[in-house]
C-alpha cells in the first residue's frame, strides 16, 4: 500500500510538471496561477503544495527535469580528465543543440525561460538560482578549456574566462533565437557545422590574456628590381 501511494505521488508530480510546461508556455510563467496549473493537471491546488513549496519551486523543478541530463554530462566532463578536451566540448555543445531541436520538453522549457518569464514577484527567487546555475556551467566549461591548455590544444596564455563567456554567449544566443523562430532552419541538421565553426575558431585563434604582447607579423621589405 505504501509503495502504491509513493508511485501515485510520483505520477501526480509528473502531471503537475507537464501541466506547468504547457500553461507557462501558453500564458507566461508570471501570468499563470498555481490553481490553473492544478486544474490543467486534473488535481487539487493542495496537491501542488504537497509537492512544491510555491510557484518558484515548481518552476525550478520543471527546468531541472529538462536540463538535468546535460548538466550532469557537463559536470562530469569538467571534473574528469579528458583525452581530447576540445572534442568533448564539441560533443557537448552539439548534443545540447540537437536535444533542443528534437525534444519538445526542452523546447517548451527554454521558450518559457527565454521569452515567457519575468523574474519578479513570485518568481523573483528564480533569478538567484539561475545565476548560480549559470556560474556553475561557466566553471565546468572553463575547467574543460584548462584541460585543453594542459593537453597542448590551446596556448598557455589563452584567456579561458573570456573564451568561456564567448562560448556561453554563442550557445545561449543561438538557442534563444531558434526557439523564437523554429522554422528558420533545421537546427539538428546544422548543429554539428555551427559548433565545428566555433570550436575551430577557438582552437586556431583563442583569446589571449592581457599583459603578454603577441609578436607582430612584419611585412616583408620590398627590394627594387
Regions inferred by a protein language model and the residue ranges of each:
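C-terminal peripheral helix-coil segments that are non-catalytic and often amphipathic
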Residues: 91-99, 135-151, 165-225
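Basic, helix-initiating cap at the start of DNA-binding domains
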Residues: 1-27, 31-43, 57-60
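Amphipathic alpha-helical packing segments from all-alpha helical-bundle domains
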Residues: 68-71, 75, 83, 87, ...
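Short secondary-structure transition hinges
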Residues: 94, 98-143, 153
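Hydrophobic alpha-helical connector segments
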Residues: 61, 75-108, 160, 164-167, ...
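Amphipathic alpha-helical segments enriched in hydrophobic/aromatic and basic residues
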Residues: 24, 33-34, 45, 55, ...
